[in-house]
UniProtKB/Swiss-Prot annotation:
ATP binds at A17, F18, S19, G20, G21, L22, D23, T24, S25, A43, G129, T131, D136, D194. Belongs to the argininosuccinate synthase family. Type 2 subfamily. CDD domains: ASS (cd01999). This is Argininosuccinate synthase. Its EC number is 6.3.4.5. Pfam families: Arginosuc_syn_C (PF20979), Arginosuc_synth (PF00764). It catalyses: L-citrulline + L-aspartate + ATP = 2-(N(omega)-L-arginino)succinate + AMP + diphosphate + H(+). InterPro entries: Arg_succ_synth_type2_subfam, Arginosuc_syn_C, Arginosuc_syn_N, Arginosuc_synth, Arginosuc_synth_CS, Arginosuc_synth_type_1_subfam, AS_cat/multimer_dom_body, AS_multimer_C_tail. PANTHER family: ARGININOSUCCINATE SYNTHASE (PTHR11587:SF2). L-aspartate binds at T131, N135, D136.
Length: 445
């Protein structure tokens, strides 16, 4: 039996992830008029552009919800965000600038916590505002069914009747006004924005064109660092970790991780830190483009990565990075709680993060321009005296190095033999000015 309902289940409880915006407001009232019994569930994710969460469930009741609940997801959101940071679960980068998977993390939290609340209320049908071309429809589908195996999915935006009657924002606004709610449609922006406490995503509309850049975006978590009229003074900040957990900023300890991240957002936001412009592959493998903000996570990540490189050896760091990229992709796909993801997370949190204790001082300037000023940790394996060019007690002698280099003769000989084989089969051609052969181009005869 299909878990996806293509038409409204009249007479039944239908839970809707309710943001209070035009789309979900119109959908909720429409479902009520068509005979369903809507229940509204709002996730408090600490969105920087939402200033009155308590009013949202009240509006849902006004629009016809049989019940409305506000679910505080902030602590869980930050916990999952720090777990992603500890694991390096970020696979989308451009020239070293990282997207911190803030929307996928938010969906993992929303998709599980809201469905758990619905299950408590005996609501086994769930709807949300995700469209069929995006990533969220699959993320919510997976997380919802993980929590409630009896869950059915009803999405108004997949119901042709709803689309025919309320297919656009103008129609939705008119529908709400005719119902007596005096709903004033907000002015259309040149792009859409989705946010939570970890970060913000700006995409679609004008940003679908690669000829439009970051300069059309109005940041909601920081400053437009590219504008000459925005004055940004350099600022030094210290970040301290204990056993992989961020615990202090500028010497101030935080017992509450939510408060720590809020302060990290304020510090990083003053500089526009953590903004990036990325082209990515959606779950369905179509490319999309987004401009992202994550000032707090970016600040913590700089310090965390610095300590990782100062504490762990090369092979551990390599495994951490490779696993992190794989884990980031799983997170992006809505598989954050799948066994293979848990395995990768636990490995990084146990064997990488727990050794990360120390303090890093960073100078922040404009955007992602920063300098690391100092690094302190009782666990550092960085010992400059081992490699000092001064006359100091050394862990090895010149004669030891001669022996080590002599042992390299075997693999150098092996490489030379392989190059000769490649030349014999026509893959390489002898160099004219070098003893080394040259790679043949496709046009070479």
């Amino acid at each position: 039996m299909s878990t996806i309902l293509e038409s409204l289940p009249t007479g039944q409880k239908v839970g809707i992830a309710f943001s209070g915006g035009l789309d979900t407001s119109a959908a909720l009232h429409w479902m009520k008029l068509k005979g369903a019994v809507p229940y509204a569930y709002t996730a408090n994710l600490g969105q920087p552009d939402e200033d009155d969460y308590d009013a949202i469930p009240k509006r849902a009741i006004e629009y016809g919800a049989a019940g409305a609940r506000l679910i505080d997801c902030r602590a869980q959101l930050v916990a999952e965000g720090i777990a992603a940071l500890q694991s390096g679960a970020f696979h989308i980068t451009t020239a070293g600038v990282t997207y911190f998977n803030t929307t996928p993390i938010g969906r993992a939290v929303t998709g599980t916590m809201l469905v758990a609340a619905m299950k408590e209320d005996g609501v086994n049908i769930w709807g949300d505002g995700s469209t069929y071309k995006g990533n969220d429809i699959e993320r919510f589908y997976r997380y919802g069914l993980l929590v409630n195996p009896d869950l059915k999915i009803y999405k108004p935006w997949l119901d042709q009747t709803f689309i025919d009657e309320l297919g656009g924002r103008a129609e939705m606004s008119e529908f709400m006004n005719q119902a007596g709610f005096a709903y004033k449609m907000s002015a259309e922006k040149a792009y859409s924005t989705d946010s939570n406490l970890l970060g913000a995503t700006h995409e679609a509309k004008d940003l679908e064109s690669l000829e439009s850049g970051i300069k059309i975006v109005n940041p909601i978590m920081g400053v437009a660092f590219w504008r000459d009229d925005v004055k940004i003074a350099a600022e030094e900040v210290t970040v301290r970790f204990e056993a992989g957990q961020p615990v202090a900023l500028n010497g101030v300890e935080f017992k509450d991780q939510v408060e720590l991240l809020l302060e990290a957002n304020r510090i990083g936001g003053r500089h526009g830190l953590g903004m990036s412009d990325q082209i990515e592959n959606r779950i369905i493998e179509a490319k999309s483009r987004g401009i992202y903000e994550a000032p707090g996570l970016a600040l913590l990540y700089i310090a965390y990565e610095r300590l990782v490189t100062g504490i762990h050896n090369e092979d551990t760091i390599e495994q951490y990075r490779e696993n992190g990229r794989r884990l980031g992709r799983l997170l992006y796909q809505g598989r954050w709680f799948d066994p293979q993801a848990i395995m990768l997370r636990e490995t990084a949190q146990r064997w990488v993060a727990r050794a990360i204790t120390g303090e890093v001082k960073i100078e922040l300037r404009r955007g992602n321009d920063y300098s690391i000023l100092s690094t302190k940790s009782p666990n550092l394996t960085y010992q400059p005296e081992r490699l000092s060019m001064e006359k100091v007690a050394s862990t090895f002698s010149p004669r030891d190095r001669i022996g080590q280099l002599t042992m390299r003769n075997l693999d150098i000989t092996d490489t030379r033999d392989k190059l000769r084989v490649y030349s014999q089969v026509g893959l390489l051609t002898p160099g004219e000015t070098s003893a080394l052969p040259q790679i043949k181009g496709d046009g070479d005869k």
